[in-house]
């Protein structure tokens, strides 16, 4: 461990690789709600969060785990599910009167076209104003899962262990997106979090 008069012990959550406090401060200075996008290999989560005197407050949330409520049958950790999760969170944000936000990617790497930016694109398309650079957004064909379907067609064996046919993913995406657009959206704040647990979901997984 480093020592010396100039050495500063990092804050606990930074040592645990969970929170980038410099980034958090920049986001808070914007004065806008944070669109907290967190991804793993299996799931995608999105929340609209504002700071408060007693901790962060989660106003709306969406999780790819709940896309099945709208007919989603494909895996929940890919780009299409990330877009749908962001779109669902965006619709709930508009319903809650939140029409602008800033993207909080936590400690995820800011790689153009990755899942956190696809979540952002979904929220933007739902009507939430989020400052962004167009160069980080994925092609629409990738949002629909056309690259996954093309790969599945080249395989002799099914791509997924489930009964879902990956070659139909783009059409399935279109159907579920239309279902979400036509749905009576509720302001769900339950994405495996409570009022002060946005730090755990709102930081790196």
From Swiss-Prot:
GO terms for molecular function: 5S rRNA binding; structural constituent of ribosome. It comes from the Archaea. The keyword RNA-binding applies. Transmembrane segments: none annotated. GO terms for cellular component: cytosolic large ribosomal subunit. It holds the Pfam family Ribosomal_L5e. Keywords: Ribonucleoprotein, Ribosomal protein, RNA-binding, rRNA-binding. One of its GO terms (biological process) is translation. The keyword Ion transport does not apply. Belongs to the universal ribosomal protein uL18 family. This is one of the proteins that bind and probably mediate the attachment of the 5S RNA into the large ribosomal subunit, where it forms part of the central protuberance. PANTHER family: LARGE RIBOSOMAL SUBUNIT PROTEIN UL18, RIBOSOMAL PROTEIN L5-RELATED. HAMAP family: Ribosomal_uL18_A. Part of the 50S ribosomal subunit. Contacts the 5S and 23S rRNAs. This is Large ribosomal subunit protein uL18.
